[in-house]
């Protein structure tokens, strides 16, 4: 992004998602990729605040749990706090400078903001469960099992940031060479170096998108399974389950967004060069998913090292991780080496929490979480109105 506001007229319907013209007017009347506008509207309709959920009863129930079950809950909370600390700033910081599609730009900003709500949720939970929440937060950076997962995510974001700076420097060198009299050879060399830097950045961005996709698709779900299990099979911690249900609902949107971007790049919608990059990076992208698979299985073992939860075990979680990995890799166009023994969902009841439409509750009994706000369809034309007039 060479400027925060491009004053040159641009056909937004012809702009690629990345590496196009600078962004100008923020407009939402037309979109090349309607998916991003739909995701933004859906995310805005989901707006929620963690303080809406009362956790007083959860705190009392948590204090009655045996120590190993308290540790399972706390460690998952720490892990999710770390993941959303990254996601609450990284998508906008790393991707926004490269975006040239207005609807994608708005979606990335909306997505990143929603992640900050998730981070605030963990603070809300900790304040209600622990007498000293600051101590729990301070322990996160000291936990090796958590931090090695952060390193594998942050590395790819940082690589995009570094390669973006290198590319921008090369662009500046090209402009400098143009101003140098009788320096055709220098200009030619600068243009060549800029092209090399741009392609390296494109590869870095493509792999980073897979890292983000794997994070949204797999990394949260061991924690989700444990949190929802407290409510489903132990009939406690309903407030926390509600908050995690809100978070899981948001993550489904974020996952859909990254999957869509990847498939568009892989199919050449934004140019043949992306198809070549997708082919070159296929093995590394698949390896990223398999590494996430391995790390999450390690995390399950770490969580259950001192004891388990009724209804869950390391074996069940491992099958759940494999089930997710196969499905998610297929959805983002990658080959998967895992062969499932069964195609049945290892934790079928979790769908109740991941799909809000499956839950029916009496409003007077529980706080409803399955409602939307500001969901009005404004695309009403004369044909629709004519259909209504027959009832007048």
Name these PLM-found stretches.
Residues 2-392:
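Non-heme di-metal
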């Amino acid at each position: 992004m060479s400027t925060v506001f491009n004053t040159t007229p641009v056909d937004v319907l012809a702009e690629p998602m990345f590496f196009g013209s600078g962004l100008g007017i923020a407009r939402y009347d037309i979109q090349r990729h309607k998916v991003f506008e739909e995701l933004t509207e859906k995310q805005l309709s989901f707006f929620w605040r963690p303080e809406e959920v009362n956790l007083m009863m959860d705190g009392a129930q948590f204090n009655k749990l045996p120590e190993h079950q308290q540790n399972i809950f706390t460690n998952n909370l720490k892990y999710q706090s770390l993941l959303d600390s990254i996601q609450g700033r990284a998508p906008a910081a790393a991707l926004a400078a490269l975006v040239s599609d207005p609807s994608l730009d708005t979606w990335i900003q909306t997505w990143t903001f929603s992640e900050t709500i998730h981070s605030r949720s963990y603070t809300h939970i900790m304040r209600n469960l622990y007498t000293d929440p600051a101590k729990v937060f301070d322990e996160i950076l000291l936990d090796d099992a958590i931090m090695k997962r952060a390193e594998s995510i942050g590395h790819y974001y940082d690589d995009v940031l570094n390669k973006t700076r290198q590319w921008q420097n090369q662009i500046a060198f090209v402009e400098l060479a143009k101003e140098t009299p009788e320096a055709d050879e220098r200009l030619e060399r600068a243009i060549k170096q800029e092209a090399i830097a741009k392609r390296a950045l494109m590869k870095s961005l493509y792999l980073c998108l897979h890292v983000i996709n794997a994070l949204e698709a797999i990394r949260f779900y061991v924690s989700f399974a444990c949190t929802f299990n407290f409510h489903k099979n132990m009939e406690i911690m309903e407030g926390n389950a509600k908050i995690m249900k809100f978070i899981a609902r948001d993550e489904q949107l974020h996952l859909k967004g990254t999957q869509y971007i990847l498939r568009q790049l892989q199919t050449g919608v934004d140019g043949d060069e992306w198809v070549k990059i997708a082919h070159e990076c296929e093995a590394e992208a698949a390896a990223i998913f398999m590494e996430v698979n391995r790390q999450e299985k390690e995390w399950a073992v770490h969580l259950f090292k001192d004891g388990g939860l009724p209804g869950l075990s390391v074996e069940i979680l491992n099958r759940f991780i494999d089930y997710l990995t196969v499905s998610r890799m297929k959805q983002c166009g990658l080959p998967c080496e895992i062969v499932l023994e069964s195609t049945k969902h290892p934790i079928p009841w979790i769908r109740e929490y991941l799909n809000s439409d499956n839950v029916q509750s009496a409003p007077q009994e529980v706080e409803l979480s399955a409602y939307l706000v500001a969901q009005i369809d404004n695309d009403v034309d004369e044909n629709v109105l004519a259909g209504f007039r027959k009832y007048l």
